[in-house]
Swiss-Prot record:
Active-site annotation: 62 (proton donor)
Primary enzyme class: lyase
SMART domains: OMPdecase
Record protein name field: Orotidine 5'-phosphate decarboxylase
Pfam families: OMPdecase
Species for this entry: Lactobacillus gasseri (strain ATCC 33323 / DSM 20243 / BCRC 14619 / CIP 102991 / JCM 1131 / KCTC 3163 / NCIMB 11718 / NCTC 13722 / AM63)
This enzyme's EC code(s): 4.1.1.23
Higher taxonomy: Bacteria, Bacillati, Bacillota, Bacilli, Lactobacillales
Length: 235
């Protein structure tokens, strides 16, 4: 089975989206991540339209609220034809459980229920921030493991984590869980605003289920060639 490489579309309007997408290849061969910028500017209709065109979609809104609100939000998102969506693991087990129930309730008959991924610690969070700003006494690996265990028990299908943490998670949480990893930079690329990064080959070696890559693809001279090269390296 081919491991997905998901293109992070850090764009804020449909015009930029329409300029980029044809450069990535045929819709059925492209897995995209839509975040807050595009969703908040263009609304749910753009997600539904892209799904109908054949794109696989990771809708990354990182929901975090009281369980009832998250249930209703997830129920609405499940109607858009997405493959993955996210909540913050720090929202707790009841919220994660509510999100999963909302996705199940909202998915149209005959369609696949979107996979629920819980965000552990953002890849922009360093050990210093974890300890000094979040007042967490655990190591990064311990904190991520604790959040992943909570998410799995609450019904999440997987987690968003750094590739550096996947090996430890697989050993302790199991292989029957998705490990989707941003913070991917091909060799020679700048880290930008990411703190905990790896190459596609390292992510493969350490056991990532899927990787999320943005600027190394979207800002490349030939985005489709860059995308295909990263797919090859990861698979």
């Amino acid at each position: 089975m081919t491991r997905p490489v998901i293109v992070a579309l850090d764009l804020d309007n449909e015009k930029k989206l329409n300029e980029l997408l044809p450069k990535l290849g045929k819709p059925e061969n492209v897995f995209i991540k839509i975040g807050m910028e595009l969703f908040f500017n263009e609304g749910p209709a753009i997600v539904r339209n892209l799904s109908r065109q054949g794109y696989q979609i990771f809708l990354d809104l990182k929901m975090s609220d009281i369980p009832n609100t998250v249930y209703n939000g997830a129920k609405a998102l499940a109607q858009l034809g997405i493959t993955y969506t996210t909540v913050h693991a720090l929202g707790g087990s009841q919220m994660i459980k509510a999100a999963k129930e909302g996705l199940i309730a909202g998915t149209p008959v005959g369609k696949n229920i979107p996979k629920l991924l819980a965000v552990t610690e953002l890849t922009s969070i360093s050990d210093d921030i974890l300890h000094e700003e979040q007042n967490c006494n655990l190591s990064m690996n311990q904190q991520v493991l604790s959040l992943a265990e909570t998410a799995k028990k609450a019904g999440a299908d997987g987690v968003i984590c750094s590739p550096l943490e996947v090996k430890n998670l697989r050993q302790n949480v199991g292989d029957d869980f998705l490990y989707v990893t941003p913070g991917i930079r091909p060799a020679g690329n700048a880290k930008d605003d990411q703190s905990r990064v790896a190459t596609p080959a390292q992510a493969k070696e350490w056991g990532s289920t899927a990787i999320v890559v943005g600027r190394p693809i979207t800002l490349a001279t030939n985005p489709e060639a860059a995308y295909e090269a990263i797919k090859k390296e990861f698979n």
